[in-house]
């Protein structure tokens, strides 16, 4: 975990990994380049979530919601209660920020924390000294720059990560960020996967021969490849992780067609949701399930589940993929 004075280091970070933006236009719109932009539905969902959590917080502070009921509500909004103060974890999808987002996070660090924040190893940002009652207000400020803390904690699908130089590194097969964004949109508020046996982490890599996203240390790793016919698709890994039981993931499918990304992920997580342990949180990650079943048996279960899904509504339409890709233009210096 990298600890920085976010206010003082803002200039240094600009030069390293930020997208620079023109100013806000007269109608209040932010002109963005090279990253996904919320549409009206995206923004409305986040605004409604902030208002909902503000109401839940008010009722909790008034004693109308007991502690055990408030626990999953705060976790769903990225809040851990630690020894001295709450910790609020902010999602930074596939590690990409623009300058306005970083400035808002710096203001939050200055006004609601102690001038510091932690960038985590999985491309999130954490505040360690906010007041619990001020967290909805913080989330409201983040919503103004299209950020949130949804699914940054709890037993759900977490932030999808990729290479920190995605989109600019010469060795990548294609830009992996559109695929990360597709996974983000699919997994956020997914009703079936809100209460998994344990947290679930996905990483995407697009450099063949170099695991630049540490995909084999994730619950699911997606390696973008081309088959012998030149078709774009994925090699899929499952069952990796660190912690007290570090395991490198295994290949569960050598080639998955590009349009089948979400249906196959759906199948993997359904198998995990059904067979993963819930009696011991230290043995509840998918890596333990894959090891217990064996990768061959686990793959058979996934393939059987996928048979029911692969020709359904979850197949990724080419026009939707192109729409997402259109947000990720090359920077001027390439």
Language model features: what each stretch is:
Residues 27-334:
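Peripheral terminal and linker regions in Fe-S/redox and tRNA-modifying enzymes
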Residues 3-4:
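Short, low-complexity, intrinsically disordered N-terminal modules
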Residues 13-21:
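Short hydrophobic targeting helices and cationic amphipathic motifs
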